[in-house]
A protein has these predicted regions:
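Conserved ATP-binding/catalytic core of the eukaryotic-like protein kinase fold
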Residues: 6, 14, 48, 63-169
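Short N-terminal regulatory/linker segments that flank and modulate the kinase catalytic core
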Residues: 1-77
Length: 169
């Protein structure tokens, strides 16, 4: 894992992440007008403040963990939650108008036929069922060994947060 120390190293990892193209980075740098002596942390903070990337994305790149910030055409914006099957991220794509939730099957389950079947069944059910209490699944996608559901993003609070606010009923 390569941890960036200065802005050129940060920008190299940012480009390698796939979040921004080299041209987009050049345009951002022209707009930000950062000094050459800018540290990786200062560069990341400037890109976040200008909304070129999210705090989650900046943190991952600063840690040297730039892989996985793009999954297929989707750009991972932040972690929404995680569980036994994997993680759920908020994501967007240049060719899609809304942010979505990506439910990504954990790497350890990518070769587990039982978990892949479970993900496919969940996708089928989520695409067929229509109910205000069920989040709509838009599609099931795979890129390489990464399998994931693309779902409508519904903002709200978790059950844990609800119980903390209102107490058990």
């Amino acid at each position: 894992m390569q941890i960036p120390q200065d802005s050129p190293e940060f920008l190299n990892l940012l480009q390698r992440s796939g979040l921004l193209t080299a041209d987009q980075i050049r345009r951002a740098l022209a707009e930000l007008n950062l000094p050459e002596t800018t540290s990786a942390h200062e560069c990341a903070a400037a890109f976040v403040a200008a909304r070129f990337i999210t705090p989650f994305q900046a943190e991952r790149i600063i840690e040297g963990r730039y892989r996985g910030l793009t999954i297929g055409r989707w750009r991972v914006r932040e972690l929404l939650g995680f569980g036994g099957m994997g993680c759920v991220y908020i994501a967007d794509a240049p060719d899609y108008p809304n942010k979505v939730a990506l439910k990504v099957l954990a790497g350890k389950h990518a070769v587990d036929n039982g978990m892949l079947t479970r993900l496919r069944l969940e996708a089928r059910a989520g695409m067929k069922l229509r109910h205000p209490g069920i989040i709509k699944t838009l599609q099931l996608e795979s890129t390489g060994a990464v399998h994931f559901l693309v779902m409508d993003l519904v903002r709200g609070i978790s059950l844990h947060e609800l119980v903390a606010l209102q107490g058990p009923q």
